[in-house]
Amino acid sequence: MDELADSDVNLGQYVVNAFLQAFMNAEEAAFAVGRGHTTYQEPVGIFSASAGITTVALDAAGAITFDDIKDLISGLPSQYLQSASFLMHRATKLELQKLRGVGAAGPLYDQYLWQPSLIAGQPDMLCGYPVYTNDSIPQHGDGALQKICAFGDFRRGYEIIDREGASITRLNELYITAGLIGFLAVRRVTGGVVWPDALRILVEP
């Protein structure tokens, strides 16, 4: 309690910022792999949706190939391509950074397909589409039938509903006998796939 009152550092604001960061981390995971409200009180994540999203299987076990990425992109209807992007684990991203074009000739022959961003805050590109990462997503090599990469127009395919803005209440009285101050943080959000045709999922064979 004394630290909150006497410190030159605004510890109260530090606590608030810590809660907000914790909310962001939890939501990032839940919108990707959340298991639903019925049992777990979580949103249904993009990679957990049990029906509706068309899946594209890797051609074979082992390394992801250029053909796998082409199949994933070509499987998405053209009306969603303009705003499409990739979403994957960082380890999968690292593997894709090593992909080169194949074939005997052509502009992509033996050229890296990955386009690193040269502007701070802008995403890297793969085959002309932005790439975003989320470490909650299964990574390539985690096992058969694992969903390892999503591609599509996420704004149209997945809806996030903010049911209640974050509220953080300082509890001055509850722990007063112990010389402590408590904080109660509450935030209610949900999310789910609303337009599965706008999304495609790459899965392990």
Regions found by a protein language model. Give the residues of each.
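Flexible loop/turn segments at secondary-structure boundaries
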Residues: 5-6, 38-39, 92-97, 138-141, ...
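Sequence/fold signature of self-assembling virion shell proteins
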Residues: 9-22, 63, 102-205
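A beta-strand-loop signature enriched in Asp, Gly, Thr, and Trp
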Residues: 51-131
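Alpha-helical scaffold segments that mediate packing/assembly in large oligomeric complexes
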Residues: 1-75, 103, 108, 201-205
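Residues immediately flanking
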Residues: 1, 90, 185-187
